[in-house]
A protein has these predicted regions:
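A sequence-level detector of short, solvent-exposed, charge-rich linear segments
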Residues: 20, 24, 38, 74, ...
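Helix-turn-helix/homeodomain-like alpha-helical modules used for DNA recognition
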Residues: 35-116
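Arginine residue identity/basic-tract feature
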Residues: 3-6, 29, 70, 99, ...
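Generic structural signal of hydrophobic/aromatic residues within well-ordered alpha-helices
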Residues: 27, 52-55, 59-66, 174, ...
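Hydrophobic protein-protein interaction segments
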Residues: 103-215
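Short, highly charged low-complexity linear segments
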Residues: 28-39, 57-61, 79-80, 121, ...
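Short, structured coil/loop segments at alpha-helix boundaries
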Residues: 28-32, 49, 85, 166-171
Length: 215
């Protein structure tokens, strides 16, 4: 530790992250780094005390970004994913709620209720709609999907049904929304354009993805 403090041995990334967290030190400011011209990477640090606000802030940040890009003819959006992208499912209220519900269930710091008992604030529903709509204004979008992208979602819904956190009626409602979404995606794939006339390219990969990556 002494040699690190003297600068003879550099801190590892993990050590620097711990120091930053515990002491409230901004590593960006120490390094004098400005990210105004760099691509944005988001490590989802979650405020467990208020997950709704964390989720809202995440969506609202991207809504503001989409606003700035909607008239840019060079703007492009790309994602390689093993789940259905937010740009496509967020306008469907139940599917969006399910993804949020699943995240809360997986987070050990948040006590999760039954799916029907989870009430999504209206401002989150509104920003979800804005997110989905504005993303379609991007001049060009490229999607690369895991071939299991729909099966992953179906299996997740069935799992929560099996452990009685989703009722049979609600499972049927989710199924109906998913069928509507697949119809929309079929039309999108055939046209190759959004309703605003912007290009969309969809590729289904035979290689399964470990995670989702976007730019």
């Amino acid at each position: 530790i002494y040699r690190r403090l003297r600068g003879e041995v550099p801190f590892t990334f993990q050590e620097a992250a711990i120091i930053s967290k515990e002491l409230g030190i901004s590593l960006d400011r120490i390094a004098g780094v400005s990210f105004s011209n760099n691509a944005m990477f988001d490590i989802n640090v979650v405020d467990h005390g208020n997950p709704f606000e964390t989720y809202y802030d995440f969506l609202n940040k991207h809504v503001k970004l989409f606003h700035t890009l909607r008239e840019d003819p060079n703007a492009s959006l790309g994602t390689a994913s093993n789940v259905i992208p937010q740009t496509l499912y967020l306008k469907h209220e139940l599917l969006a709620k399910f993804r949020f519900f699943k995240w809360m269930y997986q987070n050990e710091h948040i006590k999760c209720k039954h799916f029907e008992e989870l009430e999504i604030p209206q401002k989150i529903i509104n920003v979800q709609q804005d997110f989905a709509k504005l993303s379609h204004h991007i001049h060009s979008t490229d999607y690369i999907w895991d071939s299991m992208v729909f099966l992953h979602l179906i299996n997740d819904i069935q799992y929560f049904s099996d452990i009685h956190l989703i009722s049979d009626e609600m499972k049927q409602n989710l199924k109906e929304e998913l069928l509507i979404l697949t119809d929309e995606l079929e039309r999108l794939a055939i046209k190759g354009k959004t309703d605003f006339g912007n290009d969309v390219h969809i590729y289904v990969s035979q290689i399964n993805f470990e995670a989702t990556y976007s730019y």
